[in-house]
Amino acid sequence: MRPWTGSWRWIMLILFAWGTLLFYIGGHLVRDNDHPDHSSRELSKILAKLERLKQQNEDLRRMAESLRIPEGPIDQGPASGRIRALEEQLVKAKEQIENYKKQTRNGLGKDHEILRRRIENGAKELWFFLQSELKKLKNLEGNELQRHADEFLSDLGHHERSIMTDLYYLSQTDGAGDWREKEAKDLTELVQRRITYLQNPKDCSKAKKLVCNINKGCGYGCQLHHVVYCFMIAYGTQRTLILESHNWRYATGGWETVFRPVSETCTDRSGVYTGHWSGEIKDKNVQVVELPIVDSLHPRPPYLPLAVPEDLADRLVRVHGDPAVWWVSQFVKYLIRPQPWLEKEIEEATKKLGFKHPVIGVHVRRTDKVGTEAAFHPIEEYMVHVEEHFQLLARRMQVDKKRVYLATDDPSLLKEAKTKYPHYEFISDNSISWSAGLHNRYTENSLRGVILDIHFLSQADFLVCTFSSQVCRVAYEIMQTLHPDASANFHSLDDIYYFGGQNAHNQIAIYPHEPRTADEIPMEPGDIIGVAGNHWDGYSKGVNRKLGRTGLYPSYKVREKIETVKVPHVPEAEK
């Protein structure tokens, strides 16, 4: 008998045991259906564990296949190393079995159930309060009505903050916060590996390429989003992005003088065949494809926002409140890796400004946006939401000072804000405001300023701005890369989040709605609603695609429709 035969039987025994483990867990998942009051969060964690176990089972199978060595001793060489790896996997499996047994035996933690009941009670008490106070308002007039309405809104705010605080703590109980941290980190590392692999082909002369010119006729935030759009198409079509940035309006030396190159091995656009974008299928045999701006893109591929990769969608839905934003943020993260001089600038600015937490970021865009793409918003509109969020933060952390990082292209606003709100500490660099003016916009000093503003806005605990501004949306996107889920860490005074040139943003009705006014539209569960915007008053505006009717509908009666797309990737990128 050959020496490897015994080892092979031993390996088969391990695989059999592993399969038994998967069957055991699967059985538990089925039996858990008899207890519908189990937390959906608990089920998500178990499913995530099962997915990891399946992956490890597949790893073991591949390792076992590789151990089919026809001859030679097994106590040395590659086979020996693989067997030791199998032993380590087995130890990990035993640990996971024990952890799972403890979890299923103990059920949900005490803190989880206490918080769940507190939230349930808080919702009931809020309803009782609303009914009572609104009945009182019916019988009041004049100054008494105004006084009672003000008290009513103040008390309502306390109720809302109480429930939101309990929800925050609930999201952290029973290891959920730790799981979310790890899952977000794992997903980010996976995507960054895939991007890095695609951007660094072994042979640039043979690589399929997509060429993108940075000089779109707009500002920094718009140009960055233009490159992100190019990058997402390159990723979806499995091409290496070639970024042409020589004579960039902001820095004539090009992108690489500010940020790290998008590729270490392939920056040359040359190839056998070159052509303009004609669609993924028609361009299949074209080595180098030039991409137009998104406004002129035809045909439109499915890789545009707000789609996310099909193979990541389930994990993203569990870990993040807005998977589409998270996916966009991964390309922003890769693109804006700073050169050493910029890193130093950011560090020095952080010390000079005294930037520290807690802090809320406020971005006020004036100049060219007002009257064209956005309405004028006084500082008071922003500060209402700043104060509300500081009151919420104070329920779970020590707020020594109410700090606000103020980014604006209006140099007079800092003085106005300090005068009107003396109890706040405003952190701002007025030289950046001056450089953001139209007459100074396309300079290296202006570029430095907008990069610093975006950096500090993204670092804030909460963001108040107008999503009609590209700078604000870039800051929000970067914020997603700094936390497991920062999807709710903002308030926009105008638009909901969008990506310029995106495909349709759809929602799905989960409750029926009968219109009460001519401005509203009817809905039935399952109807697809194309959302145009949120009015931030409990209602959104959109079109019922089944009926073709446009109007208002209650925002709580819909959920986001997650669009997925198959994106190919090579196994080598997973390593």
Swiss-Prot record:
UniProt keyword list: Disulfide bond, Glycosyltransferase, Golgi apparatus, Membrane, Phosphoprotein, SH3 domain, SH3-binding, Signal-anchor, Transferase, Transmembrane, Transmembrane helix
SMART domains reported for this sequence: SH3
SH3 domain residues: 502-563
Disulfide bonds, paired cysteine numbers: 204-266, 212-230, 218-222, 465-472
Tissue-level expression: Highest expression found in brain. Also found in heart, lung, spleen and kidney.
The GT23 domain, residue ranges: 206-493
Cytoplasmic-side segments: 1-9
Region (Important for donor substrate binding): 365-366
Entry's transmembrane regions: 10-30
Modifications made to the protein after synthesis: Tyrosine phosphorylated by PKDCC/VLK.
Record's keyword annotation contains Transmembrane: yes
Membrane topology: Single-pass type II membrane protein
Motif (SH3-binding): 299-305
Recorded catalytic activity of this chain's protein: N(4)-{beta-D-GlcNAc-(1->2)-alpha-D-Man-(1->3)-[beta-D-GlcNAc-(1->2)-alpha-D-Man-(1->6)]-beta-D-Man-(1->4)-beta-D-GlcNAc-(1->4)-beta-D-GlcNAc}-L-asparaginyl-[protein] + GDP-beta-L-fucose = an N(4)-{beta-D-GlcNAc-(1->2)-alpha-D-Man-(1->3)-[beta-D-GlcNAc-(1->2)-alpha-D-Man-(1->6)]-beta-D-Man-(1->4)-beta-D-GlcNAc-(1->4)-[alpha-L-Fuc-(1->6)]-beta-D-GlcNAc}-L-asparaginyl-[protein] + GDP + H(+)
SUPFAM superfamilies: SH3-domain (SSF50044)
GO biological processes: GDP-L-fucose metabolic process; N-glycan fucosylation; protein N-linked glycosylation; protein N-linked glycosylation via asparagine
Top-level taxon of the source organism: Eukaryota
Topology feature Lumenal, residues: 31-575
A single GO cellular-component term on record: Golgi cisterna membrane
Leader sequence residues: none
UniProt pathway: Protein modification; protein glycosylation
Locations listed in the record: Golgi apparatus, Golgi stack membrane
Enzyme Commission number(s) from the entry: 2.4.1.68
Family: Belongs to the glycosyltransferase 23 family.
Function of the molecule: Catalyzes the addition of fucose in alpha 1-6 linkage to the first GlcNAc residue, next to the peptide chains in N-glycans.
Name of this chain's protein: Alpha-(1,6)-fucosyltransferase
